[in-house]
């Protein structure tokens, strides 16, 4: 009985995710950039790691090392097609301290964002040099959350620009409403509404249809809608967005309300180069 229990515990330990040592969590914008561009997302566990020789790593810049990785698929999070239980890929990693190759070990867990390799069912290609992420349950939860929103019936569209903006003063001093129309990749109507009332904190909301709900709250940080806005809106309102004939006061009010939205959204937080 004791031998059976020990064997059971060892098997359970082997199957459990092996989280990497504590490391800074991948920022939401960086994770979203990768997740939205990758046809394949998976939690893998390495079974073999081989550093390739220089002649096998053509095009790899100085200070970067290329590795061949074989890995078991622990969990297939997203894929356009089934994958075998074991896959392989190559990853390019920067040198570690003193210019030495970074240490990759067998049995390490990673999240990978990749694409299938045509004609090679067991091979995938990382969509970016930084598309192998150290595994943690928090990282996986963030990845799954982004993909869940992206695959919903009506995900927030990609923002491609800013259209016209309009400002209407209210009947009371300090009362006004500004509406800023956004351009999107699929043509869906998206607009920002900013309301000001005397003695109240200015409020703004975003509408993903032609119906504007003035009572709606701004998007929560680290959501797909927040990402679409915070990482796509330009730092200042384009001149052509101000209507012809707008007074200097109305133009200034529109710009101030646009700045209010940007300040509320905060920085995008992207730190990784986009592929």
Where would I find each of the regions flagged by the language model?
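Transition segments tied to proteolytic processing and entry into folded domains
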Residues: 15-275
């Amino acid at each position: 009985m004791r031998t059976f229990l020990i064997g059971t515990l060892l098997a359970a330990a082997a199957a459990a995710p092996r989280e990497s040592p504590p490391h800074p969590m991948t920022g939401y914008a960086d994770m979203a950039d990768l997740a939205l561009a990758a046809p394949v997302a998976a939690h893998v566990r390495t079974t073999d790691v081989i550093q390739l020789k220089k002649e096998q790593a053509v095009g790899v810049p100085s200070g970067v090392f290329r590795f061949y990785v074989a890995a078991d698929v622990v969990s297939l999070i997203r894929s356009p097609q089934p994958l075998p239980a074991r896959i392989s890929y190559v990853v390019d990693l920067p040198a570690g301290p003193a210019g030495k190759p970074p240490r990759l070990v067998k049995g390490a867990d990673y999240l990978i964002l990749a694409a299938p390799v045509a004609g090679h069912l067991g091979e995938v290609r990382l969509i970016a040099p930084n598309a192998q992420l150290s595994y943690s349950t928090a990282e996986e939860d963030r990845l799954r959350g982004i993909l869940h929103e992206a695959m919903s019936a009506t995900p927030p569209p990609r923002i491609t620009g800013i259209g016209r903006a309009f400002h209407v003063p209210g009947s009371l001093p300090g009362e006004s409403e500004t509406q800023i129309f956004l351009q999107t990749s699929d043509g869906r109507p998206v607009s920002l509404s900013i309301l000001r009332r005397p003695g109240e904190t200015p409020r703004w909301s975003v509408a993903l249809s032609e119906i504007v709900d003035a009572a709606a709250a701004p998007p929560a940080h680290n959501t797909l809608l927040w990402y679409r806005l915070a990482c796509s809106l330009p730092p200042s309102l384009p001149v052509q967005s101000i209507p012809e004939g707008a007074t200097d006061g109305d133009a200034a009010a529109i710009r101030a309300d646009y700045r209010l939205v940007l300040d509320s959204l905060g920085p995008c937080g992207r730190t990784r180069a986009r592929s």
